Structures are given as C-alpha cells and as structure tokens.
Amino acid sequence: MKKLFLLSALLIFACSSGGDSDNNEIGNLEYLGTYRGNIDVFLNGTYHSTLNNHQMTFVSIQNSNQVNIIGNLIMTSNCTFDQDGFVIPETIPVTTELFYALEYGSGILNGNSLEIELYQDQINSTTGNVQGTGFWTGTLEKI
C-alpha cells in the first residue's frame, strides 16, 4: 500500500506544471482553444457549399505558439498562432508522380472571432501548372 501511495505522489509531482499554465516565455496563450462557425467552400474558384458549425481546435505544442490544428480543412495541421492569429506557411503535404498539393493559409484574430482563409492547390508535377484549387473561408467564434 505504501508503494502505491508513493507511486501516486510521484505521478502527481511529475505531471504538475510548476507554475501558472496561462503564462510562458511567449506570453498568455488564452487565444488558443476551440472556434466554431460556418465555412464557405470554393472549388476551382466556384462556390461549392457551406460547412455549418465547423469546429477547429488549436492546441499548443510544448506551451509555445507552435500549434496543432484539430479539425483543419486542409492536410497541413501545424502552424504558428499568436495574439494576432495564425499562419500556415506554404507546405507540400503530398507528392505523386502526377501532381503535388501546395497548402497555405491564415486566420486573423479579432477578440473572440477568427476569420480564416485556407488554400490548397493541386499542381501538375511535370508542367508546374495549377490543375485544381480549393479555398475555404469563414468566421469562427471561440467557444
């Protein structure tokens, strides 16, 4: 029984943050969390549909402004996020002999609102010409 108690105590101390979890070297991360709203979808420049009540969650990687995106609409799921919003730099998440995908995007934070723009271009590997495009845009509210 003493060993079980000791193990429990060690786990509690090992898992504690040792300080205020809202503050770190880069400042307050309260802007991270879950945002929900409607997203308009455009394929090859033409409106396709609206995703109602879509949810995206931004989770800090090791208490930094580097985050994982849960529920992203493109394959790229990492970005930087600060008090102004997020940026997904140009990324090639998939390549085949015929094409590759180029993704990028951003989100502008204004209070509890996050206005997003996400892009995915399908590019011919031989010619470099764009074969198809996807564009997602909308305003999400922090929940």
Q: How should each PLM-predicted stretch be described?
A:
Residues 36-43, 90-93, 115-124:
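Generic short beta-strand segments
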Residues 7, 13-16, 111, 128-132:
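Residue-level recognition of alpha-helix boundary/capping or hinge positions
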Residues 75-76, 115-143:
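Edge beta-strand at a domain terminus
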Residues 27-52, 140:
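Tryptophan-anchored aromatic micro-motifs
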Residues 49-55, 97-104, 131-138:
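Amphipathic hydrophobic-ligand
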Residues 1-2:
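N-terminal hydrophobic targeting signals that begin at the initiator methionine
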Residues 5, 10-36, 143:
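Bacterial Sec-dependent N-terminal signal peptides
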